[in-house]
Every structure is written in C-alpha cells, then in structure tokens.
Amino acid sequence: MLVSYKWLQEYIEIGDISPQEIAEKMTRSGIEIDFIHERNKGATNVVVGYVAEVAPHPDADKLNVCQVDIGEEERVQIVCGAPNVSSGQYVAVAKVGARLPGGIKIKKAKLRGQHSNGMICSLQELGIDSKLVPKGYVDGIYVFPETQSVEPGQDALAIFELNDSVLELDLTPNRSDCMHMLGVAYELAALYDRPIKMPKTKVKEVIESADGYINVSVENGEDTPFYQALVIKDVKIGPSPSWLQNRLMAAGIRPISNVVDVTNYVLLEYGQPLHAFDYHALASKSIHVRRAKAEEAFTTLDGEKRTLSPEQLVVTNGREPVALAGVMGGLHSEVTAATTTVVLEAAAFHPTVVRRSARLAGLRSDSSARFEKGINQERVSEAARRAAYLIQEIAGGIVLSGAAIADARVRSERVIALDLDKMNERIGTNLSIMEVAALMRRLQFPCEKVGSDLHVTVPHRRGDITIPEDLYEEVARLYGYDELPSTLPVGNTTQGKRTAEQAKRRKMEAYLRSAGLSEAISYALTSSEKAALFAAETIKPIQVAMPMSEERSTMRTSLLPHLYDICTYNLNRKNNDVLLYERGSVFLSEQETLTELPTEQERLAVLLSGTYMSHPWQGEKKAVDFYVLKGIAEGLMETLGLSEQIEYKPDVRPGFHPGRTANVLLKGESIGFLAQVHPSTQKALDLNETYVLELNVDALFAAETEALIYRGIPRYPAITRDMALVVSKETTAAELMAIIREAGGELLETVSIFDVYEGEHMESGKKSIAFSLTYRHAERTLTDEEASLAHEGIVAEVQKQTGAVLRA
C-alpha cells in the first residue's frame, strides 16, 4: 500500500510530524513501513509555461519553434520535438539552469540553427514512471487540462505535488483496514491522539428519481450481501484535474478519465471498490447479480475473452454479463468519451467467491484484493456518495435522487468484554480501567464499564478484532511496546519428561532405524486416483477445495502410494536396495459431502525391496522376503511390549499377493497388514519384488503395554528336544506354537521354528514344520525322563488337535 504524505493531511493534522517520524511510529506499533519514496527525483526550477506561438522549424521536419510565456518580462524561444505541442497550451517548462532527474542540467542551446532557451517537459522527464503517465501523454509533452486554472511562472513541481513523500506499507493479512487512506488516518489518529476529518459526501440531488432508470436484484444474498446503483446524468468525460491525477500516480495507478479516476480515487480513499457503467451501453434498466452459467462467454475491460464457470459471480443486465463481480468490468459497458449517463455500482461481495472468481479468471485487481480480505460493509453507501460528489464536482454530473438497492446484510454489533486483570497480566502492565478506556477512545472504539470489565464495541472497519486478546494487542500497541516493563519469567523449574506416547514414538523410530530402514517423508496431499487406491469401500477420499494441482488435490488415505513413488524414483536411478519407513497422518471419512472434520489417524508404513543385508567381503547376501518383513514387525511389537497381544492371520487384499498377505490383529482387532505387492501391480508401477507393511500407530500406542518382568540367569541346566510335524498346508505355524505352549506347561521354556519343508517326498497338500523345544525346571535339575514325558504330552496334544504326524 502506497500512502501519500500530502494526501494524508486531508484527513488528519500531521504537518508538524515528518514522514520519517510517522514511519518510525507506525513500524514500532506493528505496521511496518518498508520504504519512504520521494516523488521528486531531483527536478528543480520547472514552471508553468503558456505556448503563445508554434512555428515549424525551417530546417527540421519533426521540430517546432515555440514562443513560450513563463511569467517573465519576455517570452522565451524553445525548440520542441513533441508531436502534440500546439499554441494555446499550458505546459511544464524547465528553465535554463534547471535540473531534471538523472542529473540533466538545462542549458541554452542551438538546434539546427534555432536558439532554444529551456525545455518543454513530458511527465517521464520529470521522473514519473511511464506506466503511470496518462496514455494521451506517453509519447509527448504533458498539457494541463483546460479546466485547470494555472498561470505562467507558477511552480509546476508544486502543481504536480512532486514535493511529496510516499510511504510504502507492508501490511499483514489481518490489517486490511489500512489498505486505504482513511484506514491509515484512523491508525495515525489513534497513535497521535488526533481527530479525523472525513471527506465531503453531500450530493446535490435533483427531483428526478433513479427508480425510473435502473432496478437491482441479486440471486443469492450470501454471495452479494449489498448492492447499490446510483444514476448520474449529463457527465462530461475528460481528463481529471492535476490534483486527482497526481494522487493516483503517487499511489501507483494510471489516470484514465475523470469518472474512472474518481472510482479509483474512492477505492484508495475508502477501500471500497466501485465500478462505473455506461448506462446506454448496458441496454437495460435491470441489473441482476448471479452465478455465471457453465461455459458462459465474457470479455473483460482488458480485452480478454473469458469462459466462465458457475463458481464465478457476474453482474448482468438481466441477459448477459457486464462485469465479473468484484474483479473487473466488461468491455462493452465501459465508460468512454461518448458516455453521458453513468450507473455507479457500489457493492459488497463475499470474499471467498471473489477470490475463487479471480483465481479461475487468472486475474487479480486492486478491487479483488480488497474484496478478498473483506470490506467495511457499513461504509459502502458513504463511499458511493463520495464518488457521486466528486463526479458532480469535476465532471458536471447530475445525480438522480435515490438509489436502486438490494440489501441482505446481517447487522450485528461486536461487543468484547475486556478483563483488566487478565490484560495487565498478559502484557505486563498495571493500567487502570480509565487509562484503557482512554486508549479505546483514541481508537474510536466505544466502550463502557460493566462491573470490573470494560465492554468494548468494535467498529465494522476493524474486522481483525474478534477476541479479548486482540484488544490486549491494541492496548500494547498504543501504550507503546517500548514502554512495556521488562520482567524475568517467574515459575518453579521442573524436570521435563516425555509423555508415554512420545516415548513410544521414539522407541519405535529408533528400532526401525536400527533395523536398517531409512525414514521417508511425503506430502499429505495426493491425487484422487492414489487416494482411492487403498481406501476401504466405505472410505470417501476428501477433496481439497482449491488445490494447487491435480497431484495435490486429495487428502491421503494411505501412506503406501507415495512410498511406491519413492521406491520407483530410486530404482530408476539404479538404487536397487530400498528399505524405507514413514510415519504420518491419513485422513478418513465415510461422508460423500463433508459436514464434519475427517478422522486423522497416525500410521506407520514400511517398504522393502532388493537386498536386505549384504556382506560382500564374505560373499553373503540376503534378499528381502515376506519373513524379513514379518520379522521386522515382530521386533517392533516386542519393542513396544505388545508381542503377546499380536496375531498374524492370512488375508486377501486387492493389489497384493494372495498367498503372502497377512492381517495384523491386536487383541482380535485388525490394526493393519503386511504383504508382498502383487506381481501385476509391481509391473504396472515399475517395481521389483516389493514387500510392504502398514499399521495404525494410534491403536498401537493406545494398547496397554505388557510390563517388563525381570528373570534371573537360570541356575539349572536345560534339555532340548526337536520335533518335525507333517501337517496340512492350511495349518499355520502360529496355531501349532500356541498348542505347544499351552500343552508344555511350566517346564517348557521356549519354542522356535528351525525348518519348514514342502516338496519332494512330501505328500500333496502337506508340509513339514520342525520345532526346537527347550525344557527347564526353575528350582532343580530337570531329569531326562521328566523332559521326555512333557515332550510326549505335547506331541499327543498337537496330534489330537491338528491331526499332525511326526516326521520320521
């Protein structure tokens, strides 16, 4: 936001305060001033000149010899090459001895035999950016408007207000109230405790009513809470007076014509976007605001043909769009030199609708920037009256009485209770309620004492003030951050410790790293196709309202798709051994249309591909397989103290190998799975043989951990027995081990698998599983007979329950 120091003085008396002091004060109060720009880039001795005579140069086709009155006894002769120079003009003249930006000094000269005593200047030569110069003067000298009263010899630099400073404000998103001159004036009024002077808005209306010219309707009051149209007849379109042009250029806006310039001026003054339509070009007495139709065509003021969508809001003449609401007007209803009657639009559009509309159009304007952040809806009509007043003053318009209005605003006062004790405790002050009330009055926030609290009514212009803490900040800003007392923190020092969940998370990640895995971190947003890849049938992927791209349009429902991408990325770069884990959130919802927040679930995913362990110097390699992955899972459960509560049962899942997929159960409830990726999926994704695991971390951390029990080093020897059981292929090792443990009683210390065999010499549909069993008595030496008796009992029980046969 660019703020002219001279313009600012129209609203508040600050002539005794320098721009540098203002910048320092505002920066210290929370609104940063990035730069102070001086409009005069080094120009001196430039005056108003009257071109009395113009004659062609006798020896140069493109030069003219001008006799110019510059307020001295005699006219001066100046040779000028501008194509638009003509007698009867008032122009800016750099006298002999003057200096112009860039260190140029004007001297007496002789051009093709003709004396030249000065220079008729363009605005660019006075240091004004070409992008801000009115289009009619881009390629020539500047000519003062006929309506402007100037005299030869007047200081032209003062008329152009080049002896001005411009403050560049770096506003944070919450301070959109300072995106206009009055907002900055309110801020300074609070900082310096000075009154505000409001602009003139009283319009001379005629008896003729606007009702006979225009009527207004809106399709949706939420999209358009307020819309007002004024009608102004008999306007004379022409250039704006210099003071208006100067202020627009100081704010970084190019002057166009008096009516359009007024709308831009009020935008900068009130922060209220306005738009002027040519009444006759509207070709209708109706203005209707609605959503655009699918594929509806519309040409904006910049000449671009645009295809609209129902997400965009348009102003129509009842038939077709005449403006992209809150963003830009239409080419066919713009104000031109032929315009005589103007319809002045002043409206409040919903910020989100304008933001979406501007984004879809790829078009961001000064108007949309203000609508997006929210405008003061209570000042819309006042801003319209201000614009009507200015048009009446500088374009000779006749303002018809009344206005066409559609009003769906919901009016409510924002009253916040300020607890004085809490405020003083928070900001470290000891202010009385009277002192705080005085600060609120400086902000022009009405307030009253209710009990021990101060009830503050927040004006609509300050949309950033919504909670007591916002008022605390305002008090601290006005009181002065530098004045806040310095105090040391008070409190008892306590030894910090991790929560149980933090400790488990650290143990889990430490174990995974020790198992040789590397951590991966991927985006929580994915494509809709990947989000649906592993989602349960009841889970509906959640679409982001305004995604940056299709690849980041949906909240993920699984960690695996991105791990697949990472694995493929590594394989494509000849890194064939990929051992990864990722811990992150997934977002789950069963709603087709989201009305409640989705469930955010923390998960752990593991991906293994290639070689798990390699010792080249020994010639040893171990490729990843299902049992390596299951071993990592079992080690993790042991680390978390959950081994006895976990079961692994065969499972079938889409996208995974039907014979190498297991459901992971915690106390009978599924918390995830481990599996080999199906060969067809591996081929489609350019993966090698790949194994994955995905677990619900929330469920793991919520489970009751088994207590660690100390067991001393055994004092008595153990006896080991082996057994090889031939069972059906459907019988799992886990089932056999459960029977063995139950039948073994107290004497059985451990049981482990040391061999699984299928193939030659084995009956069809059968497999052999060999177990090693260790027996030990806790209080004495176990005899061989006791161990044999226990072993035979186990064999008998296994045979009874499963039909197993001892393998010879």
Swiss-Prot record:
It is found in: Cytoplasm. It catalyses: tRNA(Phe) + L-phenylalanine + ATP = L-phenylalanyl-tRNA(Phe) + AMP + diphosphate + H(+). GO terms for biological process: phenylalanyl-tRNA aminoacylation. This is Phenylalanine--tRNA ligase beta subunit. Residues 714-807 form the FDX-ACB domain. The lineage of its organism: Bacteria, Bacillati, Bacillota, Bacilli, Bacillales. The keyword RNA-binding applies. Its cofactor is Mg(2+). It comes from Shouchella clausii (strain KSM-K16) (Alkalihalobacillus clausii). Tetramer of two alpha and two beta subunits.
